[in-house]
């Protein structure tokens, strides 16, 4: 499905906006601080229940207001009816999800209905940040590929939290075994899903990287979070004293990673900023295209500050690849000259200024 209409109320510096959207490219043009990134943030929040810029709800609510409200209309594909989704959140962080006019929906339902890929200047953490960012990349794919993944992941987090708390109190492994008896099968199952997903998507990533960065030989390897030759049950028992001293579980799926190297060297040590951005875009595009091929559902792409770190030829390469996906794309830019050659009959340009958003006529 595509997002055909977006309503925003009291979000960041946007008091009210009602945006009719193109099914292709949607360009948001304005100066720094105008609110163009806030539109991307609103779309992301509608599909995730949280912002990509702040974990505190109060920071995204317009000053002097009690809550923000977001609403989207999803256009139908073949044999599908039009859908509506809504999200409101107050300063205490309490959320209300509405789907097709009915309250009581879940954030996970929004994520299923509005799958998206986000590319921002801060997104370099996917490549040079800690393992949690690359786990999130893998888990996005598992969430959309395996219906049982989300509940297993939630239970894993719960059990790890309980186990870590218990490590502060127990003196013998037998006292913590009840948690491990639940944790071990979940850990093995999640590890299997993650490993299979990385195996399945690696060729897509490799092919996209060859187009974007043909000068490098890149490798991608899944690290499961413990010695792959070790049985996880035996490892937990063997490392009990160490875990008890640390007061947390040192090994497991919560330590998994995706190792990305160029010519055998970590990419953050080999690639320039512009090359890292292209690699980040390649990963997001490959994941979105793999998702579409597997599910038959399109993925949205959100690109903040499109031109940053990229010269003209690289911008053109990225724009051409995005167009080839035939997906809905939202792009922010400071200068309209950076995106005018991307405008066509299936796109719209919005001028954003001080939280006010207007559709711009196309010549």
UniProtKB/Swiss-Prot annotation:
Signal peptide: none
Transmembrane segment boundaries: none
Gene Ontology CC terms: cytoplasm
Superkingdom in the source lineage: Bacteria
GO molecular-function terms, A-Z: ATP binding; single-stranded DNA binding
InterPro entries named in the record: DNA-binding_RecF, DNA-binding_RecF_CS, P-loop_NTPase, RecF/RecN/SMC_N, RecF_2
Compartmental location: Cytoplasm
Binding site for ATP: 30-37
UniProt KW Oxidoreductase keyword: no
Gene3D superfamilies: P-loop containing nucleotide triphosphate hydrolases, RecF/RecN/SMC, N-terminal domain
Annotated keywords: ATP-binding, Cytoplasm, DNA damage, DNA repair, DNA replication, DNA-binding, Nucleotide-binding, SOS response
KW Nucleotide-binding (keyword) present: yes
Family recorded in the similarity comment: Belongs to the RecF family.
Function of the molecule: The RecF protein is involved in DNA metabolism; it is required for DNA replication and normal SOS inducibility. RecF binds preferentially to single-stranded, linear DNA. It also seems to bind ATP.
Record's protein name: DNA replication and repair protein RecF
Organism of this sequence: Photorhabdus laumondii subsp. laumondii (strain DSM 15139 / CIP 105565 / TT01)
């Amino acid at each position: 499905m595509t997002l055909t209409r977006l309503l925003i109320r009291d979000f960041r510096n946007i008091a009210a906006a009602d945006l009719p959207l193109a099914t292709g490219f949607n360009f948001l043009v304005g100066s720094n601080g105008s609110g163009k990134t806030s539109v991307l943030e609103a779309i992301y929040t509608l599909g995730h229940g949280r912002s990509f810029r702040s974990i505190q709800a109060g920071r995204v609510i317009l000053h002097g207001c009690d809550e923000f409200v977001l609403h989207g209309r999803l256009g139908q594909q073949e044999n599908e009816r039009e859908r509506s989704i809504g999200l409101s959140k107050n300063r205490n962080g309490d959320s209300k999800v509405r789907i097709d006019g009915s309250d009581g929906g879940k954030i996970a339902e929004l994520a299923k209905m509005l799958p998206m890929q986000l590319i921002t200047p801060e997104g370099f953490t996917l490549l040079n940040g800690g393992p949690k960012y690359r786990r999130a990349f893998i888990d996005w794919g598992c969430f959309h590929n395996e219906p049982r993944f989300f509940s297993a992941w939630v239970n894993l987090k719960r059990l790890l939290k309980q186990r870590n708390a218990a490590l502060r109190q127990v003196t013998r492994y037998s006292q913590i075994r009840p948690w491990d008896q639940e944790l071990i099968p979940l850990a093995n199952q999640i590890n299997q899903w993650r490993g299979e997903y990385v195996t399945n998507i690696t060729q897509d990533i490799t092919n996209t990287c060859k187009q974007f960065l043909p000068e490098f030989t890149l490798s991608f390897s899944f690290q499961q979070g413990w010695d792959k030759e070790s049985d996880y049950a035996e490892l937990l028992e063997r490392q009990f004293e160490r875990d008890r001293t640390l007061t947390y579980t040192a090994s497991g799926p919560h330590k998994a990673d995706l190792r990305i190297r160029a010519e055998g060297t970590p990419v953050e040590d080999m690639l320039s900023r512009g090359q890292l951005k292209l690699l980040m875009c390649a990963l997001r595009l490959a994941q979105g295209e793999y998702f579409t091929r597997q599910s038959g559902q399109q993925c949205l792409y959100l690109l903040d500050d499109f031109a940053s770190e990229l010269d003209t030829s690289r911008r053109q390469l990225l724009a051409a690849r995005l167009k080839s996906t035939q997906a809905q794309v939202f792009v922010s830019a400071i200068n309209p000259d950076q995106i005018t050659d991307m405008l066509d009959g299936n796109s719209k340009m919005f001028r954003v200024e001080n939280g006010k958003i207007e559709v711009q006529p196309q010549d």
